[in-house]
Amino acid sequence: MSARSERACMLCGIIQPFRKFVDFGCPNCESVLHFQDNEDNQVQDCTSPSFEGLVALGDETKSPGGERLRIDSFVAGLYAVKINGKLPPHIIGDLADQNISYRPRDGSAED
């Protein structure tokens, strides 16, 4: 993976190239974050190029790692264990308006 193009969604943690987020959106969060065909700013604000660790989630598998990271109901792919950065306050507010609780994936949230 290239550190210059790969980014992690700050809401679900999936890792994709920047251009894929812009062209196709996030496969898990598109209905709430609206990356597809949006200005690059939305992708810049809601994804991070700085992440640690990888977890591979396969099709139709129950992974203990997936459950611990709260990604077991997401599409198959590579996910970041820890993502440096947080969503901007206005995005967190938009999520709250939709009754979606944001849990940062930077290690600051407690269970």
Curated annotation (Swiss-Prot):
Repeat is among the record's keywords: no
InterPro entries the UniProt entry points to: RPABC4/Spt4, Spt4, Spt4/RpoE2_Znf, Spt4_sf
Keyword flag 4Fe-4S: no
UniProt keyword terms in alphabetical order: Centromere, Chromosome, Metal-binding, mRNA processing, Nucleus, Transcription, Zinc, Zinc-finger
Localization per record: Nucleus; Chromosome, Centromere
GO cellular component: a single term: chromosome, centromeric region
Coiled-coil stretches: none
Segments forming C4-type zinc fingers: 9-29
GO molecular function, one term: RNA polymerase II complex binding
Major site of localization recorded for this protein: nucleus
Pfam families: Spt4 (PF06093)
Listed GO biological process terms: mRNA processing; regulation of DNA-templated transcription; transcription elongation-coupled chromatin remodeling
CDD domains: Spt4
Family: Belongs to the SPT4 family.
Function: The SPT4-SPT5 complex mediates both activation and inhibition of transcription elongation, and plays a role in pre-mRNA processing. This complex seems to be important for the stability of the RNA polymerase II elongation machinery on the chromatin template but not for the inherent ability of this machinery to translocate down the gene.
Subunit structure: Component of the SPT4-SPT5 complex. Interacts with RNA polymerase II.
Protein name: Transcription elongation factor SPT4
Gene name in the database record: SPT4
